[in-house]
A protein has these predicted regions:
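Active-site cores that bind ATP or allylic diphosphates and position pyrophosphate for catalysis
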Residues: 104-257, 265-270
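Short, surface-exposed acidic
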Residues: 70-72, 240-243, 277-279
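N-terminal Rossmann-like or analogous alpha/beta NTP/dinucleotide-binding catalytic cores
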Residues: 1-116, 217-221, 225-238
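Short, Lys/Arg-enriched charge-dense amphipathic segments
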Residues: 59-69, 89-102, 118-138, 262-277
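Non-catalytic terminal extensions that flank enzyme cores
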Residues: 1-15, 33, 38, 65, ...
Length: 286
């Protein structure tokens, strides 16, 4: 029986913090316990925010933390052709359509409505969809207006039917076991933009398949996004990994530790004399 394959996939748009350490260590410990392999992937598809110095810091921090990975490092920025092939396939199957509305356009439309506007699991207003009239933009958008390609969710679900995935961790509400996917909750998600070959959802699904990942271990804030990933796997005929979502570390205000809220970086803790064993204790106590 082939060895299980896990992966840790940070984005080099800032320094790693305790939340990243939790995810890296959970992946490392689970891979070791299963006599499996741990891969390292750098999710740098957003070249406007990702920087080489942050990638170098990630490698340094993981080495200091004692997290060892197998094989080379896959960088999304070097594999645009892999994602473009998938986008082209979905276009050829009439599952994608061009969309010119911006997030602010959609938010403005949602604010004009009298009834509550539907929102995705992250709280973002849903796009009107392929079959609903769009009142804010002219039929022919102005020059230079960037287009996105959205998934026709209704048509995609009609092709795949009901989908499920196996959860060995727990979602935000304690969801575990066999989970029914609910991709419809996300509406017509953007899968490609003018300046990006593919969205996070496409890139992560393609990468996991090409790298032979059998176990996806990540924070429970991505639990509901798994429904989109499960749908793409079905549309593309890809193997479905086992999913394991772990808890998040929160700050004093109850918010998820993140780069945007300036969570203390691992390198700062290291400079203060904190050891890798201390990091494990801090995580256990959080």
């Amino acid at each position: 029986m082939p060895a299980p394959v896990f992966r840790f996939a940070p984005s080099p748009n800032g320094f790693l913090h305790l939340g990243h350490a939790l995810s890296a260590l959970v992946n490392f410990d689970m891979a070791r316990a299963a006599h499996g392999r741990l891969l390292l992937r750098i999710e740098d598809i957003d070249t406007t925010r990702c920087r080489p110095e942050f990638e170098a810091a990630i490698l340094e921090d993981l080495t200091w933390l004692g997290v060892r990975w197998d094989g080379g490092v896959r960088r999304q920025s070097a594999h645009g052709d892999d994602y473009q092939r998938v986008i082209d396939q979905l276009k050829a199957e009439d599952l994608l359509y061009p969309s010119f509305e911006t997030r602010s356009d959609i938010a403005r439309l949602a604010a004009q409505g009298h009834a509550p506007w539907p929102r995705d699991p992250d709280g973002t207003p849903l796009a009107p969809g392929r079959r609903r009239p769009w009142p804010l933009l002219a039929a022919s958008p102005g020059p230079g207006r960037a287009s996105a390609w959205r998934l026709d969710m209704e048509q995609a679900i009609a092709r795949t039917g009901v989908l499920r995935f196996s959860e060995t961790g727990a979602g935000p509400g304690g969801e575990t076991g066999t989970i029914m996917a609910k991709p419809q909750a996300w509406g017509d998600v953007v899968l490609s933009r003018k300046h990006f070959p593919a969205s996070y959802h496409v890139a992560v699904v393609v990468d996991d398949a090409l790298q032979g990942v059998t176990h996806v271990v990540r924070g429970c804030d991505l639990f509901w996004a798994t429904s989109i990933h499960r749908l793409l796997q079905a549309l593309l005929g890809l193997r479905v990994p086992t999913y394991h979502h772990h808890r998040l570390l929160l700050d004093a205000a109850g918010r998820k530790l993140s780069k945007s809220t300036r969570a203390t970086a691992l390198r700062e803790l290291r400079a203060q004399g904190v050891t890798p064993d201390d990091i494990r204790r801090l995580i256990e106590q959080a």
